[in-house]
Every structure is written in structure tokens, then in C-alpha cells.
């Protein structure tokens, strides 16, 4: 049922997540430890549409977009471990809690997203995750969220 895959490149991510540009917000997952934890990477570029309006002349990645990138990292972790590539899998937010934003994330930053499973197991639909997003070792955001995994 589970695999020993410990990372995911963009090709594998696209085989797991239904998201596409401009809403695919994780570029690679460099560490996957089963359904326990993962480290995702988002290369932040000026080409992303949200920077047109957030904010003109001073682009800052919206906090909700950081949270979404973290959720996508968690979904990739679960999808890789449960071998969901090329299968029907959708993930829906149920709750977002304890969201805190500590520093700006701007074009040129590399956002590192460390996610941990707080509750959930293979076969279960409701999962809870905690995560920290950082840039150059400095915390940018932290959050806990609950998601429903609809695996078709």
C-alpha cells in the first residue's frame, strides 16, 4: 500500500495534485517521511499573478497563498506515500487554525515548508497538519489546518 518514495519532482506533483498554473504552489518536495512529515519548496517569482495587485510597487506573497502552498505540500506527502499518482485525489480545507505570519515573502525568496501530520492515517478521510514556512531559516508563517482527503 505505501511506497518508499522520499521526494517528488514537479512531474510527480502534477500526477498527484489537480492544481495547475497559476495555482500550483509547490515546485518540489525534497523530503517525504511516509505520512509523518515532508519538506516542500516554492521558488517565489515575480511572474506570479498575485503580485500584480499585492501590492503594486511592493510585491508580497499573500499569507493565504503561503497557507495554500503548505496544504499542497501536505497533499503531495500523503499522495506519494499512498501511491495516488494518476488517480483521482482532491483535498479540501475544513479548518485553518493558529495562522501566524512573521515575515514578508517576496519575489526571489525560496519558501521552505515543513509539514507534520498531527492526525490522520492511510484510509482515513480527515487529516490534521501543522506546518512552518521559512525563508533562509527565518520563520515566515506557521499554521495548523484540517483537510478532507477525497481519494475518489
Curated annotation (Swiss-Prot):
<keyword id="KW-0441">Lipid A biosynthesis</keyword>
<keyword id="KW-0456">Lyase</keyword>
<keyword id="KW-0443">Lipid metabolism</keyword>
<dbReference type="InterPro" id="IPR029069">
    <property type="entry name" value="HotDog_dom_sf"/>
</dbReference>
<keyword id="KW-0444">Lipid biosynthesis</keyword>
<comment type="similarity">
    <text>Belongs to the thioester dehydratase family. FabZ subfamily.</text>
</comment>
<dbReference type="InterPro" id="IPR013114">
    <property type="entry name" value="FabA_FabZ"/>
</dbReference>
<dbReference type="GO" id="GO:0009245">
    <property type="term" value="P:lipid A biosynthetic process"/>
</dbReference>
<comment type="function">
    <text>Involved in unsaturated fatty acids biosynthesis. Catalyzes the dehydration of short chain beta-hydroxyacyl-ACPs and long chain saturated and unsaturated beta-hydroxyacyl-ACPs.</text>
</comment>
<dbReference type="GO" id="GO:0005737">
    <property type="term" value="C:cytoplasm"/>
</dbReference>
<dbReference type="GO" id="GO:0016020">
    <property type="term" value="C:membrane"/>
</dbReference>
<feature type="active site">
    <location>
        <position position="54"/>
    </location>
</feature>
<dbReference type="GO" id="GO:0006633">
    <property type="term" value="P:fatty acid biosynthetic process"/>
</dbReference>
<dbReference type="Pfam" id="PF07977">
    <property type="entry name" value="FabA"/>
</dbReference>
<protein>
    <recommendedName>
        <fullName>3-hydroxyacyl-[acyl-carrier-protein] dehydratase FabZ</fullName>
        <ecNumber>4.2.1.59</ecNumber>
    </recommendedName>
</protein>
<dbReference type="GO" id="GO:0019171">
    <property type="term" value="F:(3R)-hydroxyacyl-[acyl-carrier-protein] dehydratase activity"/>
</dbReference>
<dbReference type="InterPro" id="IPR010084">
    <property type="entry name" value="FabZ"/>
</dbReference>
<keyword id="KW-0963">Cytoplasm</keyword>
Amino acid at each position: 500500500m505505501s511506497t518508499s518514495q522520499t521526494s517528488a519532482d514537479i512531474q510527480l506533483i502534477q500526477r498527484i495534485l489537480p492544481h495547475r498554473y497559476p495555482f500550483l504552489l509547490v515546485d518540489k518536495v525534497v523530503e517525504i517521511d511516509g505520512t509523518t512529515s515532508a519538506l516542500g519548496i516554492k521558488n517565489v517569482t515575480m511572474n506570479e499573478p498575485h503580485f500584480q495587485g499585492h501590492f503594486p510597487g511592493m510585491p508580497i506573497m499573500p499569507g493565504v497563498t503561503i497557507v495554500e502552498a503548505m496544504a499542497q505540500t501536505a497533499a503531495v506527502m500523503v499522495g506519494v506515500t499512498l501511491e495516488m499518482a494518476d488517480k483521482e485525489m482532491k483535498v479540501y480545507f475544513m479548518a485553518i487554525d493558529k495562522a501566524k505570519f512573521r515575515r514578508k515573502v517576496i519575489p526571489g525568496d525560496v519558501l521552505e515548508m515543513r509539514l507534520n501530520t498531527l492526525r490522520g492515517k492511510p484510509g482515513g478521510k480527515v487529516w490534521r497538519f501543522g506546518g512552518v514556512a521559512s525563508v533562509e531559516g527565518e520563520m515566515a508563517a506557521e499554521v495548523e489546518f484540517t483537510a478532507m482527503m477525497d481519494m475518489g
